[in-house]
Regions:
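Short acidic/polar hinge/loop motifs at secondary-structure boundaries
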Residues: 1-11
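N-terminal periplasmic accessory domains that precede
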Residues: 17, 23-46, 149-151
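A generic beta-sheet turn/junction motif
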Residues: 23, 155-159, 168, 363-367, ...
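Residues on the lipid-exposed face of transmembrane beta-strands in outer-membrane beta-barrel proteins
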Residues: 32, 151-157, 185-191, 298-304, ...
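Surface-exposed loop/interface segments of Gram-negative outer-membrane beta-barrel transport/assembly proteins
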Residues: 37-132, 143, 173-178, 184, ...
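Outer-membrane beta-barrel initiation region
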Residues: 139-144, 153-157
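Transmembrane beta-barrel architecture of outer membranes
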Residues: 146-150, 180-186, 421, 455-459
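Transmembrane beta-strand segments that form the barrel wall of outer-membrane beta-barrel proteins
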Residues: 166-172, 436-445
């Protein structure tokens, strides 16, 4: 964004018609920076910032409130089923933990937690160790950190201008174990060695790395925000012993709670009634979803002036992009557990180029200015995609495909798309007050059958700058008043598919 000089949006029919079928929804013109007159100068910009939550979380019940509300829910359900109120109350006190919640984080036995009215009994306190372990947001979220550096330089004289920039962006995401970094560069050079010749080139490229967490969709079990919001406030992040202390691994680390614990005899005991075998913090630590993306864009042009009023322009642009995504789901917790771990890889390559030749004639006959343009353009697009999915890992924490034994899916495809266009435009201007424009364009698209590949599109537009008229000179509160009308047609091949006519 720091390399952008200006941005314009064209939505009227006359402007869009000149750009053909790819402009059916409008045109965005982006002008990047170039060298400015003067000696070589340098600029360094440094931005530092943090990400924090801007909107507070909804008010939520705490552990004690949740227990009492759960008791009332079970008691009312039993009354609805036909139990007397006192029988339903006794049933709720005796069975709330064993039948519904599965975990008692307080210092009294399961059946002694509540009084006859469903309130936690006197002396009921949370066991030590649990209070600090019920905040899932604290375990899953952090303050994100962003640092950005941009170094640029520019210079210009009568025959040339130069601009370059080098940028680096590094972000630590708001959700733990998410990150993004990008290295980018741009070079722009414009030369006018003689009066009748001008040429230039604009090159830019970037290298990006991103690590995202699971659960992009709001309903995903691995979505940190949904998980932390919906898990009951009595369920801890880690497993605890009967006295409330943390259960530790052989190397002394706290064990995450997958919704159950396994004793020495291999018997599993449930520790919660939701998100069993899911754990947003644990999954984000073990899983990986990394994307590496490289881009290169280049634009070159040359203007040749001849016979006083004529200009011949050759333009070309190229876009290259390569992206490689590697995703890994571990075999311990979450999506990969049932398949003994799984790996996914997506690779895509994209390239396009546009080549355009323009001949322009401009001449002034007194107050009458004529501008005539004829041009030819061709565009080529190629997209190559490959997808692979494997399961059953051999070694943990190794997302490479050769570490998995079962091929679940292997697919790929390639898309090719080409257009060719011939266009013409005539502009007329009288004393900068009255303007008339007529354009015609003939487009051919590879998306259509050869017998119906070409379409003709035209436009006409006019405007009257009323504020330039003599009768408006005395109106000081109006500095620009324009009446404009236009009509045009543009093609649209976006919905046709690349090979629809072959089916």
């Amino acid at each position: 964004p720091a390399d952008i000089e200006s941005l314009s949006v064209l939505k009227d029919a006359a402007s869009c018609a000149l750009y053909g079928n790819r402009a059916s929804n409008g045109v965005i013109l982006i002008t990047t920076k170039k060298g400015t007159a003067g000696k070589l100068s340098f600029d360094l910009k440094v931005n530092q910032g943090i990400y924090t939550r801007g909107i507070k979380e909804y008010a939520r019940t705490d552990a004690r409130q949740f227990m009492e509300a759960s008791w009332q829910n079970l008691r009312n359900a039993r009354i609805s089923a036909g139990d007397a109120p006192d029988v339903a109350a006794r049933y709720a006190s005796d069975n709330l933990i064993g039948e519904q919640l599965y975990l008692n984080i307080f210092n009294k036995p399961d059946k002694e937690l509540f009084d006859a009215n469903g309130h936690l009994a006197d002396g009921v306190q949370m066991l030590p160790g649990y209070a600090e372990d019920l905040d899932w947001y604290k375990a899953a979220i952090r303050n994100g950190y962003r640092q950005e550096y941009l170094f640029s330089g520019n210079a210009a004289n009568e025959k040339s201008d130069y601009y370059f920039s080098l940028g680096y962006l590094d972000e630590e995401g708001y959700v733990r174990n998410s990150s993004f970094d990008r290295l980018s560069a741009r070079v722009s050079v414009n030369l006018t060695p003689v009066k009748w010749l001008k040429a230039g080139v604009n090159l830019s490229g970037s290298h990006q790395n991103s690590q995202i967490t699971a659960g992009d969709q709001g309903a995903s079990f691995a979505n940190a925000f949904m998980y932390c919001r919906q898990i009951a406030p009595i369920y801890p992040v880690h497993l605890h012993n009967a006295d409330g202390s943390y259960r530790l691994t052989a190397d002394g680390k706290r064990q995450y709670d997958p919704g159950y614990y396994t004793n020495d005899q291999g018997v599993e005991t449930a520790t919660r009634n939701q998100y069993v075998d899911r754990h947003v913090v644990w999954e984000n630590e073990l899983d990986k979803n990394r994307t590496v993306r490289n881009t290169l864009q280049g634009i070159a042009y040359m203007d040749v002036k001849f016979l006083k009023d004529f200009t011949f322009t050759v333009k070309g642009d190229m876009n290259l992009s390569q992206s490689d995504n590697n995703a890994y789901n571990n075999a311990i917790i979450g999506d990969g557990k049932g398949s003994e771990g799984r790996a996914r890889r997506e690779t895509l390559r994209y390239k396009s180029y546009t080549f355009q030749q323009q001949l322009k004639w401009t001449h002034l006959f007194g107050p009458h200015l004529f501008d005539v343009l004829v041009a030819h353009e061709n565009y080529s697009y190629n997209y190559d995609y490959m997808y692979g999915f494997k399961t059953a890992q051999i070694f943990p924490d190794r997302p490479n495909f050769n570490n998995f034994t079962e091929i679940t899916s292997l697919d790929g495809y390639e898309d090719n798309y080409r257009t060719e266009s011939y266009l013409g435009r005539i502009r007329y201007n009288y004393r900068d007050r009255y303007n008339l424009e007529v354009s015609f364009r003939r487009d051919g698209s590879s998306r259509f059958h050869p017998d119906n590949r070409w379409g003709n599109f035209g436009s006409v537009g006019a405007n009257w700058i009323i504020s330039e008229e003599e009768f408006m000179k005395g109106v000081r509160w109006v500095n620009n008043l324009k009446l404009r009308a236009n009509y045009g047609q543009v093609g649209n091949d976006a919905g046709a598919g690349y090979y629809g006519y072959m089916s």
